[in-house]
Regions:
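N-terminal non-catalytic structural scaffold regions of very large proteins
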Residues: 1-368
C-alpha cells in the first residue's frame, strides 16, 4: 500500500516544418491536456491529503492525536529528515582542503524563479607562482579544467587589462586596492596571447566538457556563458562585475583585510524541509523523463524519415504521446528514494549526488 495521487500534465507541441522548395518554415501548435505521467506520494495531513478537507470531528478510523507529516510507502510510514546545505547566490571563501591552493572561492549560483539546478563557480589561487606572482584561475561546471580569469573576462567582452582591473578594483587609488593590484599582475601574464573576445571564446571551446562536445561551436559557448556562468545574474557586464567582486574578496582575504568564511556556520547554510526535498527529487526525475522522451521522439523521427506529415501526426496523437511517458518510471524512482533513504537518482556508474538516510521509518514508540 502506497498513499499517492495521480499526476497529469498539459503538453504543448510546437512543430516547425521546413518547406525546402518554398524556403519557408511552417509552425504548428497543438495542446494536449491531462497526460498521465505517474503517481506522487502524498504526505498525510498535507493539502493534497483527503484528511485536510474533512472536519476533524468527522474523521473516522484516524487517531485524533496523529499529527501527520509522514508518507506511507509500501505499507511503511516514512518521515523525511531536514537537510542542511550551503546557501546559494553568495560568495564563500574557505581554507582549501588540498595543499595546492591557498585560497578557494566558491559560489553556488541558481536562477531562483526558474528553479533550475545550481551551477558551481569556483576561483582558486595557487601556492605555486610564476615570475609575476600567484595566479587566480576559474572553474565551472562546463569546463574540464581551470582557465585564467582574465580569459573569462575577455569572453564576457571585457577586453583590455585596464577594463578588467576596473571591474575588480573599482577605485585604483585606494591603498588596499593598490595592494590588490600588485597581486593581479600574475593574472595579466597568465592570459598572455589571448587578447580578443574571439580568442577567449575559442580558448574556452577547447576546454569545454565532454558532454557538450556535440555542439562545440563558438555560438554554443556564448549560450553556455549566458545560461551557466552565474545564472542568477543577467547581462555579461553584470556577470563580469560580479566575477570582479569575487576576485576582490579572495585577494582581500589573502592579504589579511578580511577573514575566511566558516563552512559549519548556519549563517552560510539553509535548511531543506520535506517540501524542498521532494521538489529537488522530482526535478531530477522529471529531467530524466524528458531526456528519455527526447530520445524516443528522435527515434520515431529517424524511423519515419522524410515523411514529416506522418511524424507530426504521430507525435501529436494523445494516445501515442502517452507511450512516451513510460508508465511506472516516476513512481518507482520516488518510492525507491522514500523506501531506502537514498535521495537522488543514480547516474551511470555514480552515486555522487545521492544523500543517504534522508528518509527514515516513523518511530511510534510511546514514552508513557
Amino acid at each position: 500500500l502506497t498513499y499517492s495521487c495521480d499526476l497529469y500534465v498539459n503538453v504543448r507541441i510546437i512543430t516547425y516544418i521546413y518547406n525546402q522548395s518554398e524556403n519557408h518554415i511552417e509552425t504548428k501548435t497543438k495542446k494536449l491536456k491531462d497526460i498521465y505521467i505517474g503517481k506522487l506520494p502524498v504526505m498525510v495531513g498535507s493539502k493534497a491529503c483527503i484528511l485536510s478537507i474533512i472536519p476533524h470531528e468527522n474523521i473516522l478510523s484516524e487517531c485524533r492525536y496523529d499529527m501527520g507529516g509522514y508518507f506511507i510507502v509500501n505499507g511503511n510510514e516514512k518521515v523525511l529528515i531536514n537537510q542542511d546545505r550551503i546557501k546559494e547566490n553568495y560568495v564563500l571563501i574557505f581554507k582549501p582542503a588540498n595543499n595546492i591552493d591557498i585560497i578557494h572561492t566558491e559560489i553556488r549560483s541558481m536562477n531562483e524563479p526558474l528553479y533550475l539546478p545550481t551551477k558551481t563557480i569556483s576561483l582558486s589561487m595557487s601556492k605555486k607562482s610564476n615570475h609575476m606572482g600567484r595566479v587566480i584561475r576559474i572553474n565551472t561546471s562546463f569546463l574540464k579544467t581551470e582557465i585564467p580569469v582574465f580569459i573569462m573576462f575577455r569572453a564576457l567582452n571585457i577586453l583590455s587589462d585596464y577594463e578588467i582591473i576596473h571591474h575588480i578594483l573599482y577605485d585604483v587609488n585606494k591603498l588596499k586596492n593598490k595592494h590588490i593590484l600588485e597581486e593581479l599582475k600574475a593574472c595579466c601574464d597568465d592570459a598572455i596571447g589571448v587578447y580578443t573576445r574571439e580568442d577567449a571564446l575559442e580558448y574556452i571551446l577547447r576546454n569545454i566538457t565532454g558532454n557538450m562536445r556535440n555542439n562545440k561551436t563558438v555560438e554554443n559557448v556564448e549560450m553556455v556563458l549566458d545560461s551557466d556562468l552565474l545564472p542568477h545574474i543577467t547581462g555579461r557586464n553584470k556577470k563580469a562585475l560580479y566575477l570582479g567582486f569575487m576576485i576582490n574578496k579572495a585577494i582581500s582575504i589573502y592579504l589579511g583585510y578580511e577573514s575566511y568564511d566558516n563552512r559549519d556556520s548556519y549563517i552560510n547554510k539553509r535548511i531543506d524541509t520535506p517540501g524542498m526535498l521532494m521538489s529537488n527529487l522530482f526535478r531530477q526525475c522529471y529531467g530524466k523523463i524528458t531526456k528519455e522522451l527526447k530520445s524516443m521522439i528522435e527515434k520515431d523521427i529517424n524511423q519515419w524519415g522524410n515523411d514529416s506529415t506522418s511524424v507530426v501526426d504521430l507525435i501529436s496523437d494523445k494516445q501515442h504521446i502517452t507511450k512516451y511517458f513510460k508508465q511506472g518510471l516516476l513512481d518507482s524512482w520516488l518510492k525507491y528514494a522514500l523506501s531506502t533513504g537514498n535521495w537522488g537518482i543514480k547516474t551511470i556508474g555514480s552515486f555522487q549526488n545521492i544523500k543517504q538516510g534522508v528518509s527514515q521509518v516513523l518511530n511510534r514508540m510511546c514514552h508513557h
